[in-house]
């Protein structure tokens, strides 16, 4: 029996997570530029968000295999959300310190590859349940992720 629900839910999660990741990649450097006026500091925070992203990619496949696809997808998005939620909390309590923003920016990006990998590994099963061939499902999935960054 064909059920589109798992595929639609997976793609909705992909769009939401991708949109959040895209916004964060722009928002942190922009926030630093607005608060400090220093372009070098903005570039530094952009690099700080990229380096943990690259390093965490090395272990995401193993984490997905050991902990489970759905669990890793949900947990990575929750951890990323909590890291980003620290920005207004810090702004209201301690103030927006550049050093704290560097730490929060690094934390916000370290979890994204695990969620992306977990959602990609769920694609074949969701596509099969929806009656889609894998090539079409993969095209839809990658388009959804690309669309998310445009938002």
Predicted regions and their residues:
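Alpha-helical transmembrane-bundle signature of multi-pass membrane transport and export proteins
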Residues: 1-151
């Amino acid at each position: 029996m064909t059920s589109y629900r798992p595929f639609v839910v997976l793609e909705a999660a992909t769009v939401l997570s991708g949109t959040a990741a895209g916004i964060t990649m722009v928002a942190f450097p922009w926030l630093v530029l607005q608060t400090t006026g220093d372009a070098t500091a903005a570039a530094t925070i952009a690099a700080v968000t990229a380096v943990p992203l690259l390093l965490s990619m090395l272990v995401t496949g193993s984490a997905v295999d050991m902990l489970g696809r759905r669990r890793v997808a949900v947990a990575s998005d929750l951890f990323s959300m909590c890291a980003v939620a620290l920005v207004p909390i810090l702004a209201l309590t301690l103030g927006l310190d550049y050093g704290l923003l560097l730490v929060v920016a690094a934390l916000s990006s370290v979890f994204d590859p695990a969620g992306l990998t977990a959602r990609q590994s769920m694609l074949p099963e969701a596509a099969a349940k929806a009656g889609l061939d894998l090539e079409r499902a993969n095209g839809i999935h990658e388009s959804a992720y690309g669309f998310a960054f445009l938002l």
